[in-house]
Amino acid sequence: MAKVLVLYYSAYGHIEKMAEAVAEGAREAGAEVDIKRVPELVPLEIAQKSHFKLDQAAPVATIADLEHYDAIIVGTGTRFGRMSSQMANFLDQAGGLWMRGALNGKVGAAFTSTATQHGGQEVTLFSIITNLLHFGLVIVGLDYGFAGQGRLDEITGGSPYGATTIAASDGSRQPSETELAGARYQGRRVAEVAGKLKG
């Protein structure tokens, strides 16, 4: 059985919901799954004034956690066309793991959210995937076996590079069922690939 870590940062809860769906999909494929979040860098007073979702149940991850999993699925909201500074800060601290090759051969994947349909989803996914490739992970995207990729009857996230959601400029839009289904699909695929690589 593959061990999968869903590692995320979510300021307003959209990525938290996507992380739960990713984890659900991985569990459906028989994986043992943990959901963890990276530390918040925004001072508490500012986070409260900005209405950040501060009641997230997932425990905070440590760098040492990463090498204990067969797969790591990373999710974060987009910040001006790149991953959030919270996630970048966390991954930047994993240089020791990189130096030892501790993550080589593990499976990696990425998911994200943006405020708008063309708000930088794919470039954000690439900013995550680039990091994972440097760490030696084998990348799994959201392949076209997921039928929701081809929908034209609704505005929806999703890319061959990873599951995505659109939150709206004011954060009022929650992940749609199609977007959550894409996240579950990607979680399943990662768990399946990790299981095969683990043997």
Swiss-Prot record:
Keyword Protein biosynthesis: no
InterPro entries: Flavodoxin/NO_synth (IPR008254), Flavoprotein-like_sf (IPR029039), Flavoprotein_WrbA-like (IPR010089), FMN_Rdtase-like_dom (IPR005025), NQO (IPR037513)
Lineage: Bacteria, Pseudomonadati, Pseudomonadota, Alphaproteobacteria, Hyphomicrobiales
Gene Ontology MF terms: flavin adenine dinucleotide binding; FMN binding; NAD binding; NADH:ubiquinone reductase (non-electrogenic) activity; NADP binding; NADPH dehydrogenase (quinone) activity
Family listed: Belongs to the WrbA family.
Keywords: Flavoprotein, FMN, NAD, NADP, Nucleotide-binding, Oxidoreductase
HAMAP family: NQOR
Location of the Flavodoxin-like domain: 4-190
Protein name from the UniProt record: NAD(P)H dehydrogenase (quinone)
One Pfam family matching this protein: FMN_red
Cystine pairings recorded for this chain: none
Residues holding FMN: 10-15, 78-80, 113-119, 134
Superkingdom field: Bacteria
GO cellular component: membrane
Entry EC no(s): 1.6.5.2
Catalytically driven reaction(s): a quinone + NADH + H(+) = a quinol + NAD(+); a quinone + NADPH + H(+) = a quinol + NADP(+)
Keyword Protease: no
